[in-house]
């Protein structure tokens, strides 16, 4: 039936849409041909929704956008693609991919936002510990899950991303990492059950016990094996407040040693949130000292820095959860007991107390500012990597202190994670050596007035960093990976490539799903 719509919607403009209407072919008819209850958008309307992403460096023309009512509509779109010779299907959450991963040129894009409210139910796992969970739609935004869980049940998911304007299915298809991951692992380690539409068009419930191969394939699977329509996410009691702290270091070795000590402690012997970032040793308002203070009344005093410090500095970012019923003295003692072990620069400590939900939504204000000044709509050539503890010192000396010593016009995150909190049965790949590895995120923002050449230079610098890693044998993996050839993907997955290929053969043998990742080509 998909052949029915192709002749009428190959041209992505109003003229083609008018011609189709004149011929008596409407989008209602297309919906019927796909056997779905939801809406179909074609032509310019489809391109407006699914032709660009947050990265802003790719622009493609999908054949149509499917706005499903539920999983059966998604399965219908996949089955229609299977009946065609060349159509592909991509799931699009909130469009936050960087390199076109959620796009389908000439294919069908499934707009998961229309399913956001299909599931929301809190329950408890069977067993003695009464662990709470919430069933949510794959198209739900994490910020909405947070607000509803806390306001209605006093509960919250355990593991987060920094920015919560992302869909549940989107982050679970990658990993989902923030400052809680050292304790609970990524978001992929905090789900117990999924509903998935596979590349065969099947709607399948899966877990560690039931259809386990699909379950672990989809988690971190880059959308290659199925589209997540429901996830069962583990919950815990939500705290009321967070003590948010930043402390500054001049020496990378001391910064990393303190961070590694914190993430290696047992729950009550550490903070609840541990992250870190690099910033420029200067007054640049976007890249330098002003990015560190947490409150308008705070001021970064550069006279506290030794004259010997280098071009970049380092900041540990910490969070401690507490209840309204906890006394200030109790919280202060817990903080001082932990802070007292750290070797940051005296006088460069900043802290505020704020509600738990506000802390988790802290990036929301940055989003609002970026939308006001236009940088939310400009390209975002971001680079995210996992780097082993063994090589993070070399990475600092070459990348932080040389290649990006003037900043990237956005945050430069670096903080440790623990291998033991990640499940190697999932499709996520991390560095090969050691218990501790680091996430590095160069989150570049482009000024609205910037020339195309400046974006190209940023992309070239990202490539230079990756090439340096390869040339020097750095134990690294791209997070939110983007490659253009299968040879690069084979190198990325290493000895897990054969498992990845086998899983593809099981759950999407025609390579229908997620063509924007550029891992497999559509099979006839």
Curated annotation (Swiss-Prot):
GO molecular function, one term: cytokinin dehydrogenase activity
Documented EC number(s): 1.5.99.12
Location, primary (coarse class): cytoplasm
Residue positions, PTM Pros-8alpha-FAD histidine: 96
The protein's required cofactors: FAD
Keywords: Cytoplasm, FAD, Flavoprotein, Oxidoreductase
Keyword set includes ATP-binding: no
Catalytic activity: N(6)-dimethylallyladenine + A + H2O = 3-methyl-2-butenal + adenine + AH2
Positions that bind FAD: 91, 93-95, 97, 101, 162, 167, 173, 177, 228, 479, 514, 517
Subcellular location: Cytoplasm, Cytosol
Domain called FAD-binding PCMH-type: residue spans: 58-238
Tissue-level expression: Expressed in the vasculature of roots, hypocotyls, cotyledons and leaves of young seedlings. In flowers, expressed in the transmitting tissue of the gynoecium prior to pollination. Expressed in the mature embryo sac with maximum activity in the egg cell and the synergids.
One GO CC term on file: cytosol
Pfam families, per database record: Cytokin-bind, FAD_binding_4
PROSITE patterns, A to Z: FAD_PCMH (PS51387)
InterPro entries reported for this sequence: Cytok_DH_C_sf (IPR016170), Cytokinin_DH_FAD/cytokin-bd (IPR015345), FAD-bd_PCMH (IPR016166), FAD-bd_PCMH-like_sf (IPR036318), FAD-bd_PCMH_sub1 (IPR016167), FAD-bd_PCMH_sub2 (IPR016169), FAD-linked_Oxase-like_C (IPR016164), FAD-linked_Oxidoreductases_BP (IPR050432)
One Gene Ontology term from the biological process aspect of the record: cytokinin catabolic process
Further remarks about this protein from its record: Plants over-expressing CKX7 have reduced cytokinin content, and seedling primary root does not develop lateral roots. Plants over-expressing CKX7 show reduced leaf size, plant height and number of flowers, and increased number of lateral branches.
Family, per entry: Belongs to the oxygen-dependent FAD-linked oxidoreductase family.
Function summary: Catalyzes the oxidation of cytokinins, a family of N(6)-substituted adenine derivatives that are plant hormones, where the substituent is an isopentenyl group. Catalyzes in vitro the oxidation of various types of cytokinin nucleotides that are known as direct products of cytokinin biosynthesis.
Name listed for the protein in its UniProt record: Cytokinin dehydrogenase 7
Protein species of origin: Arabidopsis thaliana
